[in-house]
């Protein structure tokens, strides 16, 4: 993740906390665990720092197509969602907001997502492979 221009302390903090959320989610990515374990780690840390996690933006499976299943939510509970099986590849890429979790789609380009309340936001993405004894980061 990088910033454009000079950042104030609040912006530096949300970038740092977002990276920490991803790292905590990664620690929870274990074979025979659940996607919800990753969500719990991310959401708990974001909320503990006064931030919200966007429900509609999540990670995705990696395969032959762009954005394959499973959808990796960051607002589900520990011990829920799909079981993490060795060989699974997916992204961990939460969108963490300073304000509320609501977002809007830029209708001009049909791609850009903005916070509905105009508050700053940060996103960090990694690609993970679940292995027999843990995980491997494929892209950071």
Region annotations inferred by a language model:
Residues 1-140:
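Active-site neighborhoods and metal-handling regions in enzymes and metal-associated proteins
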